[in-house]
């Protein structure tokens, strides 16, 4: 299902356009609540996907507008006993600000409200507890509360102290009994039932005391004076409120990472309009506005530098610790800090389109989604409360039937009700997901969904696209070997000629000459020679620049230089030879060099038990050279862009759990096919739809970090779920008195309430440990390949070629880049021409990539293939 702008998404089934909306839900207190809300909305006609987040009190619904409306969704939630409203999204405010006001402030408000409730509850609970328990502790009490003659004063005063506590915490009763009446009890129902049972029994005790006085039965007065239970009811309510206060405080910290990011967003911007500078709110910045950013200021929005130079700190968004130098033409990201310098910029993305806003949106969507690991907790939550109520009733009846007192049996029933904690089940997963995704965002790792976060931890194969992922993605000059005319002279002649070419290798040579401030010479009669190189007259002298084939075609020899070129080619570099007036004057090697951290990252992934595979369109020789440098386990060479998805599928069919890492340019099908698609080096383009995880930096170490983070989060979730299940599995039997006959082990209701409160606090606090997650990066040396015999390089589709080689002859597959094709007629002409060449087994021509893939035997030469294409009226640019 693909998201589209303005909250719509396309459902692949029939192309139905679904609307996606976020709702604020009120009244939820535990997993049973979120489960009921989810079921109530999911059964509405037209509802496609419903995800309720207990931690954020939010709900995301994808639905068919032709069958369902937002009003009907809200009505369904209200019918279930809860409140709902569309999540406020001010049109003028960017998503970051919306998330800030909607998420962080909501958590702060909840914490503030709970603090007030707790403070007011304590004002009455402390004297109530002192009065009821003081005489047993030997604490001094006023004379009016001492002795049986003051039993009625003693009891009624406790009742009066309890009433404010009940009123302050009335929400438990309102929600608890309402959901109980609707046959969907939740945690509030357990609290309401437990405390109400204690209150009713206490009122019954007051009546029994009164009757005892009327009948002068002091034994009855004494008995019921000790069985009031008002302090249990009041203390239960206060302890649970205390736990919820601590929980609310902890919940507020789960979004600290995103809150810190949003705090970076500047509130104002300096804009230049009609030559006049003025300071305006950042919300009023429009596309195309010219903005001024001074040293120490935050960049207001995303844009491009027009003039000036600067050093920009992007660490908060990308995790890049070293400030990045910026000059005219460079892009800048909103909310980054201008550490030094002064520059003018043009706004290219404003409001909800800025990188910061999209980061917040992605994290918000991830925390609103559900991980598959939470399904068991969801199933248990749906039946948990009714089962607990049933256990409490059975336990109370059982102890009464075995001859125990009403007081004993009632304390058992109340303990079962108040110790049970469905809340811990509901918080186990979302707290860890929220903290984990927030921590990832701080490190420049944007995880789009809880499912992606969970799947990443089980990945056992990582497939890396070579260009732009393992390597820099841009050719640079690595070696300059002159044949006697001097390095600068060779580079000057080469750059002068190459400047007229648009080939990426030419650009690398020109850039090297410019970096060294060399002189560019005049060039005449420039000409491109397809499949060989270029030629022209440099200051009157004929200059040739190209591959070895070009030198041989022009009978230019220099065995020493040619041998050096072959050695450089063995290292994965591309040697370009230069000749002046028929004499070889030198060679320049160009390569797409490996990023500094690629080998370290691949070593880390291997140490985690993950197989690393590299996909590349390069030939086997170049692929093997890269493999030796970085230590990948296996290489699949000569892969066309459109075949990457097929290679991923082949790995999956072999039982692998695959993560694909690519730069997102031509990797979309492969990213979508993989179990986890990781787009690397996305920069400001954080909305790559095909990827599950977006890495802001172009650094493979972040892939290792993402896997480590995923494993840490899933481990934390498992710890939380274990605690939630273990706590209830042990606590409920103890509270029910299962161990009382053998060990005299019995749970006091107040202790049960305390345990329940701290169970939820424990789960949230455990999740908060993820705030200190830090990836472990080791400087381990990469694995090395000492000889070709242990090579892990394979040719794409080699398994297909082998099956066609029935007679045992050696077949090869070659890829021809062709210019001049414009339609399917062209494709047919080229395919027929190539198929007619003797020795060609199969020819496939692709218009989109402007290439042909041919399967040939050893007798077919490149010249024959080139001639066939040229004779058909097209141009074979290269053959590999």
Language model regions located:
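P-type ATPase nucleotide-binding
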Residues: 477, 481-608, 620, 632-648
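Flexible metal-binding regulatory segments at protein termini and peripheral loops
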Residues: 1-153, 165, 251, 276-277, ...
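Hydrophobic alpha-helical transmembrane segments
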Residues: 160-172, 182, 196, 231-261, ...
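Residue-level signature of catalytic and energy-coupling elements of molecular machines
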Residues: 30, 37, 41, 61, ...
């Amino acid at each position: 299902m693909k998201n589209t702008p303005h909250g719509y998404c396309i459902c692949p089934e029939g192309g139905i356009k679904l609307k996606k909306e976020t709702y604020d839900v009120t009244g939820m207190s535990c997993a049973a609540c979120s489960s009921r809300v989810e079921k109530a909305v999911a059964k509405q006609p037209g509802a496609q996907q419903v995800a309720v987040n207990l931690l954020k009190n939010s709900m995301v619904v994808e639905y068919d507008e032709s069958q369902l409306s937002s009003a009907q969704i809200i009505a369904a939630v209200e019918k279930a006993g809860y409140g709902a409203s569309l999540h406020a999204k001010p049109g003028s405010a960017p998503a970051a600000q919306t998330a800030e006001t909607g998420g962080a402030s909501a958590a702060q408000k909840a914490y503030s409200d709970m603090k007030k409730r707790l403070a007011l509850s304590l004002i009455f609970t402390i004297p109530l507890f002192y009065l009821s328990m003081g005489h047993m502790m030997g604490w001094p009490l006023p004379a009016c509360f001492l002795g049986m003659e003051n039993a009625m004063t003693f009891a009624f005063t406790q009742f009066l102290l309890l009433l404010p506590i009940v009123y302050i915490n009335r929400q438990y009763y309102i929600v608890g009994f309402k959901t109980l009446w609707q046959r969907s009890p939740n945690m509030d129902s357990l609290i309401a039932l437990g405390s109400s049972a204690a209150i009713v029994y206490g009122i019954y005790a007051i009546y029994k005391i009164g009757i005892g006085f009327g009948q002068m039965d002091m034994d009855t007065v004494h008995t019921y004076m000790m069985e009031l239970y008002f302090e249990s009811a009041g203390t239960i309510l206060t302890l649970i409120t205390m736990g919820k206060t601590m929980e609310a405080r902890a919940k507020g910290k789960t979004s600290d990472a995103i809150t810190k990011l949003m705090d970076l967003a500047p509130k104002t911007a300096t804009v230049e309009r009609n030559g006049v500078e003025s300071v305006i709110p950042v919300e009023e910045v429009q596309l195309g506005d010219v903005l001024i950013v001074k040293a120490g200021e935050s960049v207001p929005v995303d844009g491009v530098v027009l003039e000036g130079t600067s050093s920009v700190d992007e660490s908060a968004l990308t995790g890049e610790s070293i400030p990045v130098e910026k000059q005219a033409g460079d892009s800048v990201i909103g909310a980054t800090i201008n550490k030094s310098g002064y520059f003018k910029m043009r706004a290219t993305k404003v409001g909800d389109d800025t990188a910061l806003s999209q980061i917040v949106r992605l994290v918000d969507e991830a925390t609103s989604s559900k991980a598959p690991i939470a399904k068991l907790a969801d199933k248990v939550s749906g039946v948990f409360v009714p089962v607990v109520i049933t256990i409490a009733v059975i336990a109370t009846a059982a102890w009464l039937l075995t001859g125990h007192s009403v007081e004993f049996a009632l304390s058992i029933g109340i303990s079962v009700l108040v110790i049970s904690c469905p809340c811990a089940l509901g918080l186990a997963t979302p707290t860890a997901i929220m903290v984990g995704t927030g921590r990832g965002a701080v490190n420049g790792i944007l995880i789009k969904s809880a499912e992606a976060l969970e799947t990443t931890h089980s990945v056992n194969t990582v497939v890396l696209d070579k260009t732009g992922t393992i390597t820099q993605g841009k050719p640079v000059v690595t070696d300059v070997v002159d044949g006697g005319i001097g390095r600068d002279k060779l580079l000057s002649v080469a750059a002068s000629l190459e400047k007229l070419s648009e080939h990426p290798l030419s650009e690398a040579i020109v850039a090297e000459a410019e970096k060294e401030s060399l002189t560019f010479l005049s060039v005449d009669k420039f000409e491109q020679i397809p499949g060989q190189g270029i030629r022209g007259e440099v200051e009157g002298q004929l200059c040739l620049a190209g591959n070895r084939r070009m030198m041989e075609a022009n009978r230019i020899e220099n065995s020493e230089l040619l041998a050096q070129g072959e050695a450089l080619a063995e290292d994965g570099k591309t040697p370009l030879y230069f000749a002046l007036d028929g004499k070889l004057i030198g060679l320049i090697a160009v390569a797409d060099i490996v990023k500094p951290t690629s080998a370290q990252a691949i070593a880390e992934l291997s140490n985690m038990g993950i197989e690393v595979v590299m996909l590349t369109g390069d030939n086997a020789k170049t692929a093997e050279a890269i493999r030796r440098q970085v230590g990948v386990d296996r290489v699949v060479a000569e892969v066309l862009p459109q075949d990457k998805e097929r290679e991923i599928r082949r790995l999956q069919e072999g039982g692998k759990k695959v993560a694909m890492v690519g730069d997102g340019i031509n990797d979309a099908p492969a990213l979508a096919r993989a179990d986890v698609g990781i787009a690397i080096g996305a920069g400001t383009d954080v909305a790559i739809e095909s990827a599950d995880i977006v890495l802001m930096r172009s650094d493979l170490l972040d892939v290792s970090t993402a896997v480590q983070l995923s494993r840490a989060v899933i481990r934390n979730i498992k710890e939380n779920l274990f605690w939630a299940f273990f706590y209830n599995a042990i606590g409920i039997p103890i509270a029910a008195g299962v161990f009382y006959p053998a060990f005299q082990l019995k749970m006091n209701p107040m202790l049960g309430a305390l345990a329940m409160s701290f169970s939820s606090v424990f789960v949230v606090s455990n999740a908060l440990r993820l705030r200190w997650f830090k990836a472990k990066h080791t400087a381990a040396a990469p694995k090395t390949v000492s000889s070709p015999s242990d090579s892990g390089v394979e040719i794409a589709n080699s398994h297909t070629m082998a099956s066609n080689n029935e007679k045992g002859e050696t077949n090869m597959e070659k890829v021809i880049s062709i210019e001049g094709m414009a339609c399917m007629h062209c494709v047919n002409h080229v395919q027929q021409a190539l198929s007619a060449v003797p020795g060609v087994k199969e020819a496939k021509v692709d218009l989109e990539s402007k290439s042909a893939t041919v399967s040939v035997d050893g007798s077919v030469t490149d010249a024959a293939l080139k001639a066939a294409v040229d004779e058909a009226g097209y141009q074979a640019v290269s053959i590999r």
